[in-house]
Amino acid sequence: MNKKKRVLTGDRPTGKLHLGHWVGSIKNRLDLQNNPAYDCFFIIADLHTLTTRVRKEQVVDVDNHIYEVLADWLSVGIDPNKSSIYLQSAIPEIYELHLLFSMLISVNRIMGIPSLKEMAKNASIEEGGLSLGLMGYPVLQSADILLAKAQLVPVGKDNEAHIELTRDIARNFNRLYGEIFPEPETLQGELTSLVGIDGQGKMSKSANNAIYLSDDDATIEDKVRRMYTDPNRIHASTPGRVEGNPLFIYHDIFNPNKEEVEEFKTRYRQGCIKDVEIKTRLAEELIRFLQPFREKRAELLAHPKILQEALQKGTENMCALAKETMEEVHNTLELSRKWRSRLSL
């Protein structure tokens, strides 16, 4: 019988999750979780949060954000009985493996990763102000992946370079000390991102262009009403552009009535329909889609013990796996092995 392939993915706890997370990662995670060929590990990467959020009030907020992420995950169907959900900072071995891996990769190699500068820009970090922690973010990510001996990592195109770095680190370690780590492969879903409601790049909290999984009906209606469409379409009788229009991107994803969507597109191109009619239907479909998630989320937040137990169970699973991996690393590396055995600590 073939052994299950181990999958690792997760989120930084920076707040509530939004439709961009659903489209870019969560839907794919559910498919993987419910496929018997995969063994899924989902990491709440709180240490990664510190790479761009180091102020005291930001660090204090992480605790609450962990509850937010947990509630969102479980409300959409992530199942702690099928997958291991764990807290990154609760795994001591991650710190050690991160340090060891940092000896195996050059600064030039790290600085060649395109997304690093983008992260600094999004965090309003000026050039030259990059912290050692942020610069080492991709190495910490490699430690997450290889500590779990993950074989598959679902990522967007902007993170493919991170996985290539992880493969480089695995190859370097295996060549120098012995074969321990698999070289993980990337796994991409049909869609890796969702344009924000302002039409200016992908949906994100920092851009203030997100519809959250927990938004109430009135908030959804308001955000859809303000959604960016074709700027050249001043009147309903003006033929509009469908391609690249956020309004139709969302309809294609969230409106199950494909005949209706195609009719909207035809009438829009002909200048025979008002934006408000299309937006009203989109709001209705988003409300229908998100309502069960929102209700389940509220129930979970009202019973935090369920969230705690889910995280406890998964973190214990990851702790056991981490200990096994690091025992292999210590035996292979033979770092001060004789002295370590003599010390009674």
Swiss-Prot record:
Annotated Gene Ontology cellular component terms: cytosol
UniProt record, GO biological process: tryptophanyl-tRNA aminoacylation
Catalysis: reaction(s): tRNA(Trp) + L-tryptophan + ATP = L-tryptophyl-tRNA(Trp) + AMP + diphosphate + H(+)
Motif 'HIGH' region, residue numbers: 13-21
Domain of life: Bacteria
Keywords: Aminoacyl-tRNA synthetase, ATP-binding, Cytoplasm, Ligase, Nucleotide-binding, Protein biosynthesis
Subcellular location(s) per record: Cytoplasm
Leading EC class: ligase
Molecular function per GO: ATP binding; tryptophan-tRNA ligase activity
Motif 'KMSKS' region mapped to chain: 202-206
Family matches, as HAMAP family: Trp_tRNA_synth_B
Name of this chain's protein: Tryptophan--tRNA ligase
